[in-house]
């Protein structure tokens, strides 16, 4: 049962982009108490406030303006994207719709990513037969359930492609922000990242890593590091038997090359050479495309292909091995480690006000409904 505290839901609105017609759920203010259920993360109270973040000072193409609802989410220095445990996938080999939780570096809840068509028969069949080749759309929402971005990945046999769209509620439309294009290679993991500018795409970064890499560095045309997407190792049982995983996204800023090598992960990736780090603020559009790259990397290299019920004995599509020999400092722990200590309270601020509130629920609330059940009622596109 979902305990509704307050809700003000706008009617379903239709947004038209140049490429497709998309039905978007106009959750302008969703004041329900929303719970995410996971054995590793316990329960997250989505009504807990998060740290207020000023929008990044750059909007390079105008696709994501500074007043966009996506700006606070994308203005974080570090994002942790955690894929959630799928129990039917573990025990029956049944491919479920992917769901992610987005956290900041302090473990505070920022939003969700939910694949559309969780209960649709056609989408379910597509997941079982085409697996990682399937087409899908996913909604990126803030902690209030408001839609801020959409991810659209068309069907592909070899090179995957994922497009990112921003949402403009004032014009009832969506705008193409950019795309992530996989480049096939026999022994390397390669991607090209583009921004949409008018009727053309402009590449701003590339990824070119070893075949077993778990760290994906974004490099610009001068081969300088622009950011990184790192998959954290979660333990052999979870890596082998489940599709869970979390990814740490680090965005560059004007101070990206500052500090010591032991404390700066981007500087570690550059082997201590500060000039190899591109010390500039990434635009909101670049950050959105980088967020999409984490999702498509998860699909391409860290999802599993199932041949039917296997009681969890599913062979990974491709194993990974860390490409970095550095031990990251304590503040860069995985989402599970950040969320383990449910006795701590998390300070949060909203504009000029501040309060201390734990993002976790007590054991008395464990019988409440899962947040994701809201999306199990959506239909196929």
UniProtKB/Swiss-Prot annotation:
One Gene Ontology term of the molecular function aspect: phospholipid scramblase activity
| Record flagged with keyword Protease | no
Alphabetically sorted, this entry's keywords are:
Mitochondrion
Protein origin, superkingdom: Eukaryota
Which terms does the UniProt entry file under GO BP? mitochondrial membrane organization; plasma membrane phospholipid scrambling
Q: Give me the stretches of Polar residues compositional bias.
A: 344-359
Q: What does the entry list under GO cellular component?
A: mitochondrion; plasma membrane
Cross-referenced InterPro entries:
Scramblase, Tubby-like_C
Q: Where is this region: Disordered?
A: 336-369
Subcellular location(s) per record: Mitochondrion
Q: Describe the family membership recorded for this protein in Swiss-Prot or TrEMBL.
A: Belongs to the phospholipid scramblase family.
The protein's name: Phospholipid scramblase family protein C343.06c
């Amino acid at each position: 049962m979902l305990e509704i505290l307050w809700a003000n839901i706008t009617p379903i609105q239709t947004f038209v982009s140049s490429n497709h017609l998309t039905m978007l759920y106009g959750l302008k203010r969703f004041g329900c108490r929303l719970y995410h259920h996971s054995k590793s993360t316990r329960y997250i109270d989505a009504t807990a406030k998060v740290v207020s973040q000023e929008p990044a000072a750059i909007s390079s193409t105008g696709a994501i303006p500074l007043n966009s609802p996506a700006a606070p989410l994308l203005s974080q220095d570090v994002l942790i994207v955690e894929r959630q445990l799928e129990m039917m996938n573990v025990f029956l080999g049944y491919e479920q719709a992917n769901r992610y939780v987005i956290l900041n570096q302090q473990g505070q809840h920022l939003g969700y990513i939910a694949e559309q068509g969780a209960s649709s028969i056609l989408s379910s069949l597509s997941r079982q037969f085409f697996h990682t080749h399937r087409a899908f759309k996913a909604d990126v929402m803030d902690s209030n359930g408001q839609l801020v971005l959409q991810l659209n990945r068309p069907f592909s046999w070899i090179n995957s492609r994922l497009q990112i769209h921003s949402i403009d509620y004032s014009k009832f439309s969506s705008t193409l922000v950019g795309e992530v294009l996989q480049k096939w290679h026999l022994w390397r993991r390669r991607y090209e990242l583009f921004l949409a500018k008018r009727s053309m795409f402009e590449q701003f970064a590339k990824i070119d890593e070893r075949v077993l890499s778990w760290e994906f560095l974004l490099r610009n045309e001068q081969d300088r590091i622009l950011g990184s997407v790192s998959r954290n190792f979660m333990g052999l049982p979870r890596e082998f038997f489940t599709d869970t995983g979390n990814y740490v996204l680090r965005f560059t800023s004007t101070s990206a090359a500052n500090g010591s090598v032991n404390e700066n992960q981007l500087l570690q990736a550059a082997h201590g050479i500060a000039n190899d780090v591109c010390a500039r603020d990434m635009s909101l559009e670049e950050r959105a495309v980088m967020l999409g790259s984490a999702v498509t990397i998860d699909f391409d290299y860290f999802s599993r292909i199932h041949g039917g019920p296997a009681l969890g004995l599913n062979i990974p599509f491709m194993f990974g091995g860390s490409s970095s020999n550095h031990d990251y400092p304590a503040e860069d722990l995985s989402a599970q480690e950040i969320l383990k200590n449910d006795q701590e309270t998390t300070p949060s601020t909203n504009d000029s006000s501040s309060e201390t509130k734990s993002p976790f629920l007590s054991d008395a609330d464990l019988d409440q409904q899962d947040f994701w059940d809201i999306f199990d009622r959506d239909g196929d596109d």
